[in-house]
Amino acid sequence: MLTLLSYFGFLFAILTLTSVLFIGLNKIQLI
């Protein structure tokens, strides 16, 4: 159970980081 929770937390962190980086790159390109 603990490993599953940590695995999902890791996936969520990666998805959040990639989405933030993607939005940041799009904003830089829009300027």
From Swiss-Prot:
Its main location: plastid. It is a single-pass membrane protein. InterPro entries: Cyt_b6/f_cplx_su6. It is found in: Plastid, Chloroplast thylakoid membrane. It comes from the Eukaryota. GO terms for molecular function: electron transporter, transferring electrons within cytochrome b6/f complex of photosystem II activity. Keywords: Chloroplast, Electron transport, Membrane, Photosynthesis, Plastid, Thylakoid, Transmembrane, Transmembrane helix, Transport. One of its GO terms (biological process) is photosynthesis. The chain crosses the membrane at residues 4-24. PANTHER family: CYTOCHROME B6-F COMPLEX SUBUNIT 6. Belongs to the PetL family. This is Cytochrome b6-f complex subunit 6. It comes from Angiopteris evecta (Mule's foot fern).
